[in-house]
């Protein structure tokens, strides 16, 4: 059969070779893919009615897209994220401007300002991922997390960047319009920096190439997403997702970036030692507030990639007091969770203040920030959670400082015999 004689779908242009079924009508054809698409549209809530009485599909107005003020956004983040005041304020403004821009576009207003993508710097366990997760929860938008170290450029073994968009689409239950205003958080972004500032002669599969691959979807493009994931191949069906209004937040520890900044500023002018050895954490946090795009380029990020992020902010290492606050203050604080778990067994779990600080000190020594807190508490309470459901005599458990620092057994308070009966 000649190519010009191939029967094609009148709606999408796919040939009979590219589809499973092609249904004929009077001088028109429709493929199975377009039928599924139309079915999805008909399943949605009723739309406007034309003068002839027929129901017509109109552009979505997204009445549920509420734009909170920066203060409202920060207030909500404060319920879950301890510390990082500067980062929370900066991100609140960026997110406000981002969704204000989307609302203006949906209302067919001319918008001259670009996307407010965010780059978060900071050590492991400082709250970067939690801030992104909390934003998605506040705004009630789809959210997904990707690990930059698993991504490769097209043609290499690994994960295509389009699969990140697929995961967002899955989080939106394949509602394309909803996914198109979601949030994607890419962790470990510093790991795809070039090892040197000089352009590599050989291909850098997991570094510069990935940055190049991410450029378009971060800036805004129509991505052809394979609905089942994996590598693309000819004749495969794709779901088209416009990434123009997806908010991208990327984060990384950027180890030694502080030294690059110090070198640019001139170490003798900012009060640091003459050798560019290890700074104190306070010095590092201060230096990272001075970060410029040229520092990130010197670190190994390509200029085009850095240019996609007009909001760059540092998350500081958490202090001892902040780690204690994380244990007890947020709405979903981990100590509150364990207290609730034990109360389900009619047992009162008590943490002395000194014990909380001992846990925080132990977490700080682990060098993984708030992430270590959960592991420490799990190891501490695991045996108790095993025994308590089978022991009705236990009324309360008191966790003291020596329980943490010297591995002494917690104080167990038992009920009077008559209370058990």
From Swiss-Prot:
Gene3D superfamilies in UniProt: 1.10.8.60, ClpX chaperone, C4-type zinc finger domain, P-loop containing nucleotide triphosphate hydrolases
Entry's Gene Ontology BP terms: cell division; proteolysis involved in protein catabolic process
Pfam (any one): ClpB_D2-small
Residue ranges annotated for the ClpX-type ZB domain, each copy included: 1-50
Residues that coordinate or bind Zn(2+): 9, 12, 31, 34
UniProt keyword Chaperone, yes or no: yes
Gene Ontology CC, one term: HslUV protease complex
Residues reported in the UniProt entry to bind ATP: 123-130
InterPro entries on file: AAA+_ATPase (IPR003593), ATP-dep_Clp_protease_ClpX (IPR050052), ATPase_AAA_core (IPR003959), Clp_ATPase_C (IPR019489), Clp_protease_ATP-bd_su_ClpX (IPR004487), ClpX_bact (IPR046425), P-loop_NTPase (IPR027417), Znf_CppX_C4 (IPR010603)
Molecular functions (GO terms): ATP binding; ATP hydrolysis activity; ATP-dependent protein folding chaperone; protein dimerization activity; unfolded protein binding; zinc ion binding
Family matches, as SUPFAM superfamilies: Glucocorticoid receptor-like (DNA-binding domain) (SSF57716), P-loop containing nucleoside triphosphate hydrolases (SSF52540)
Keywords: ATP-binding, Chaperone, Metal-binding, Nucleotide-binding, Zinc
UniProt-listed SMART domains: AAA, ClpB_D2-small, zf-C4_ClpX
Complex and partners: Component of the ClpX-ClpP complex. Forms a hexameric ring that, in the presence of ATP, binds to fourteen ClpP subunits assembled into a disk-like structure with a central cavity, resembling the structure of eukaryotic proteasomes.
Function: ATP-dependent specificity component of the Clp protease. It directs the protease to specific substrates. Can perform chaperone functions in the absence of ClpP.
NCBIfam families to which the protein is assigned, alphabetical: clpX, PRK05342.1
PANTHER family from the UniProt entry: ATP-DEPENDENT CLP PROTEASE ATP-BINDING SUBUNIT CLPX-LIKE, MITOCHONDRIAL (PTHR48102:SF7), ATP-DEPENDENT CLP PROTEASE ATP-BINDING SUBUNIT CLPX-LIKE, MITOCHONDRIAL-RELATED (PTHR48102)
Family per record: Belongs to the ClpX chaperone family.
Name used for this protein in its record: ATP-dependent Clp protease ATP-binding subunit ClpX
């Amino acid at each position: 059969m000649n190519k010009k004689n191939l029967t094609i779908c009148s709606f999408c242009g796919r040939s009979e070779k590219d589809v499973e079924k092609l249904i004929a009508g009077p001088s028109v054809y429709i493929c199975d893919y377009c039928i599924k698409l139309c079915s999805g549209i008909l399943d949605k809530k009723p739309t406007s009615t034309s003068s002839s009485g027929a129901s017509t599909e109109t552009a979505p107005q997204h009445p549920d897209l509420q734009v909170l003020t920066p203060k409202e956004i920060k207030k909500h983040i404060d319920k879950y994220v301890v510390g990082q005041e500067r980062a929370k304020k900066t991100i609140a403004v960026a997110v406000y401007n981002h969704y204000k821009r989307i609302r203006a576009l949906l209302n067919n207003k001319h918008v001259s300002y670009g996307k407010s993508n965010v780059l978060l710097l900071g050590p492991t366990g400082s709250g970067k991922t939690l801030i992104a997760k909390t934003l998605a929860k506040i705004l009630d938008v789809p959210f997904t997390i990707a690990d930059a170290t698993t991504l490769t450029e097209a043609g290499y073994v690994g994960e295509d960047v389009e699969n990140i968009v697929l995961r967002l689409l899955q989080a939106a239950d394949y509602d394309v319009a909803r996914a198109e205003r979601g949030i994607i958080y890419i962790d470990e972004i510093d790991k795809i920096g070039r090892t040197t500032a000089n352009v590599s002669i050989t291909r850098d599969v997991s570094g510069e190439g990935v940055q190049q691959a991410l450029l378009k979807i971060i800036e805004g493009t129509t991505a052809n997403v394979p609905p089942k994931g994996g590598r693309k191949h000819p004749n495969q069906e794709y779901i088209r997702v416009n990434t123009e209004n997806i908010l991208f937040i990327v984060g990384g520890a950027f180890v030694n970036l502080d030294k690059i900044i110090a070198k640019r500023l001139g170490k003798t002018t900012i009060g640091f030692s003459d050798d560019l050895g290890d700074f104190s954490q306070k010095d590092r946090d201060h230096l990272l507030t001075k970060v410029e795009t040229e520092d990130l380029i010197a670190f190994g990020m390509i200029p085009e990639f850095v240019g996609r992020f007009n909001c760059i902010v540092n998350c500081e290492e958490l202090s001892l007091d902040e780690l204690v606050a994380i244990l007890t203050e947020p709405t979903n604080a981990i100590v509150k969770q364990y207290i609730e778990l034990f109360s389900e067994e009619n047992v009162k779990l008590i943490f002395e203040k000194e014990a909380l600080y001992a846990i925080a000190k132990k977490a700080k020594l682990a060098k993984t920030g708030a992430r270590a807190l959960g592991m420490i508490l799990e190891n501490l309470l695991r045996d108790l959670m095993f025994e308590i459901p089978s022991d009705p005599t236990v009324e309360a458990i008191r966790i003291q400082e020596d329980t943490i620092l010297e591995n002494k057994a917690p104080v167990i308070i038992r009920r009077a015999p008559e209370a058990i009966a």
